[in-house]
Structures are given as C-alpha cells and as structure tokens.
Amino acid sequence: MSSKYEGLRSEHLYRDIFDVDAPSDTTLGSQVWPRRPGVFIRNTQAGPSVEGTEPPASARELVVGQFGLVPPWVKSAADAKLRSPKLVNARAETASTSNHYRGAWLGAQRCIVPMMAFHQDDWRSGKAVPTRIARVDGKPMGVAGLWERWSGAQGEEIVSFCLLTVNANSHALMHRYGQPGSEKRMLAILNEGAYGAWLNAPHPEKAREFMRAYPAQGLTANPIEKKRAAD
C-alpha cells in the first residue's frame, strides 16, 4: 500500500506541468499521509453553455482535500475518521464495483494527484525498508485518483481523495515492494500527455484504459535514510 507521498517542491511546477495555480494554503506540509491534507486536480466547468455557442471547455482546478476517501454513505464524522485511513488506495480493477469507491468511479469523480515521489516498503531483507520511488528525470508524477465530498447531518463537510493502483506482479521494479507473499501493487501513474484525456474520459470504461503500469525504466528507487538523533 502506498500511504505516504511527497508533494511538489516548487510553486511553478503546478502551472508548468499541471496547468493549475499553486495552492494558497500555507499550512500544507511537504509530506502527505492518511487523514492529512493534500491537493488534487479535477475538472471544473466554466459555466453553462449559451444557445448557439460552443459548450464551455473543461478547466482544471486545484482542490485541498483529506488523503483517504470518505464515501458519501458514512454516517458520522467519527465513522469517517475510522474508515478513511484504510481508503487511501483503490484497486483499479474493482473500483467500479467496490462499495467504497463505486460512486466516485461511476460518477466520473476522477482527479490527478501531483507528487514528487511516493514511499513503499522493501521487504526483501526480511524487514521493512522504507523506499522512495520517483521519476528518473526528477519531474513530478501525476497519479490517477478519485475524489469525494461527504456532508454530515450536523453540517460537516469533508472533501477527500484516494490513489488508484494497478497490479505490479510482473513489473521490473515494483514487484520488489510490498509484503512477502502478497500481490504487488503500484500507483497508477499517468503519462504527462494523458492528463486531460484521463480527466475528460467520456465514460468509465474509457477511463479504465489509463489504468496501466508506468514503465520501470522511467522510475528510480532509493532507500530512505533514517535521520540521526542530535548528539
């Protein structure tokens, strides 16, 4: 499971790579883990079309949300707090049928989660070694995700998101990571040229075409060194 990732390092990357403005929220941290705030990119409509004119083009917006999806059927904020840490990764193969993710998938609530790298454990030594996975060229990744909006009976509102994953059993790099004996998974990293097509896919089955493993030669993995305590 990929439950921790690193946000973008520089504001200009949001505009240059993802065509959105950088977040104005200065409280966002560089590391994101379950129930922490992060950002995602989704489509927003410019407005209703006027008769006789072309329909408005979809524009992108950057949204701050909680990492860990909160399905709309959750009964209370307390229930959401318990469930969301377990709902950070959605299997692409079952997103359309899962009770947790079906509404977002079928409702075209697709998003892109920008990140510099994500963390996974390497268990080949017999113990978990946190490892940083990034692009070889150092550019940001755009990971396919789903978003949701939950409204509580007391007026509470939680905007949340999760990351989609694909099978990595035969992936030249990512098959090394994850618990021994378990299916290997990796995040659904999108090609840069596919960002718009993913967000604008006309129906769920078309969106499924983007659920592919990113090429191993485009990724690099390095163990994360533990910080030494000050003398």
Where are the predicted features?
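Short linear sequence motif anchored by a di-proline
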Residues: 1-231
